[in-house]
Amino acid sequence: MRLDKLAIKVATIVAGFTLTQLSACVGNTTGDRDNYSVNTLVDTGEITENSDRFIGKSVLIRNDVLQIIGNRGLILDKDRLIDGEPILVINMSETSIEISHDKTPEILIDGKVERFSKNSIEQKYDLNLESEIYGQYEGKPVIIATSLIMSPDPEDITANPEIYYNRPLAIKGEVDDVEDYGIFEIDEEKAFGGEDLLVVQFGSQAALNEEQTVIVYGVLRKFVMKELLQDYDLDWDSSIQTQIEAEHQQKPVLVTNKIQFL
């Protein structure tokens, strides 16, 4: 995460956002889909440098927001290690974003790449794109976002969990310390320092291996055993509860029923 970036805060329009709604919002990881690759994150610089390759394709991208333009537009940063330019995103999802001046994370966007023409985009999506900034992106690739979700690094969450409690999140990282009963940890790839994020699966559980790269979709909670057992119907006997509670009580925990393998 860039510490000098303008912050973003993602606020869901629909109140009482559940994990079931979250899974529907971000889409499925299996099945036919007109996209570049279901299980691949695409670099924004790769899209701007090779736009013809991506026009008409669905993509999954993750990066910092540089600027918000009105109610629908935003500029997503380019990747630091790859050539290319920032990319325009038109947000057609049911999630709004606003900028503050705090230090906050990337966002994960799912959408389709089109060639930007202000007039045609306004007509096609019934929009009124008033800002002059849009003129800078005429003829360039634009992502029409169908879903948008906060995607902080694991270490950002464990360092400042209060910012993220009870928010839907999509966390990218490597699987670590896989335990029984649907518990594992996730850490930032190639990161040094910082505390790993605890994850608890409920419902059907994905089989995981150490060092797999994944995106985990879920809601951040404080680890309070009684609440987790009640809210997610976790099948843990008393001895397991005692062991887990001793290790993780009051820590932030991401509760998930959706894991995407990259």
Task: Name what the model sees in each region.
Residues 19-22:
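Bacterial Sec-type N-terminal signal peptides, specifically the leucine/valine-rich hydrophobic h-region
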Residues 25-262:
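OB-fold and OB-like single-stranded nucleic-acid-recognition modules
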Residues 2-12:
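Bacterial N-terminal signal peptides that target proteins for export
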